Amino acid sequence: MAPKAPNYKLWAKMILGGAGIAVGGPAFVMYISPTEEELFKRYNPDLQKRALESRYERQKEYDDFVTELKKSAKSDKNIWITQQIEAEKKEKLARQMASANAAAEQARMQEEEHAKIEQMRREAGLPPTR
């Protein structure tokens, strides 16, 4: 039996259908998706006011994040490794600050305790300890 001739019409329909789905689907989603301004207009007034008030902080956080990413990207190491190293450095610094604050707080509490003892000694008519 002789081989069948290819059905070019069927192939053309399938290619056009696939292209229509591959291009038309995302285009349709973009067409029906609301823009940020349209979403913002749908907020109630309280949410709009809060969003406007916190816009600067969110923008600053995003800019800081992008700056950190750019710094990490300049390194020869993998970006995830450099970010982890930076996070560990920040955590270590925070722990050091916390321990320094705790030591200062402890010293302040000891001073207060000593001052209370001295006050009680004065009230009792005893000489100071120092």
UniProtKB/Swiss-Prot annotation:
It is found in: Mitochondrion inner membrane. This is Assembly factor CBP4. It comes from the Eukaryota. It holds the Pfam family CBP4. The gene is CBP4. Essential for the assembly of ubiquinol-cytochrome c reductase. It has a direct effect on the correct occurrence of the Rieske protein, core 4, core 5 and apocytochrome b. Residues 86-125 form a coiled coil. Belongs to the CBP4 family. It is a single-pass membrane protein. Keywords: Chaperone, Coiled coil, Membrane, Mitochondrion, Mitochondrion inner membrane, Transmembrane, Transmembrane helix. Residues 99-130 are annotated as: Disordered. One of its GO terms (cellular component) is mitochondrial inner membrane. InterPro entries: Cbp4. Residues 108-124 have a biased composition (Basic and acidic residues). It comes from Pyricularia oryzae (strain 70-15 / ATCC MYA-4617 / FGSC 8958) (Rice blast fungus). One of its GO terms (biological process) is mitochondrial respiratory chain complex III assembly. The chain crosses the membrane at residues 14-34.
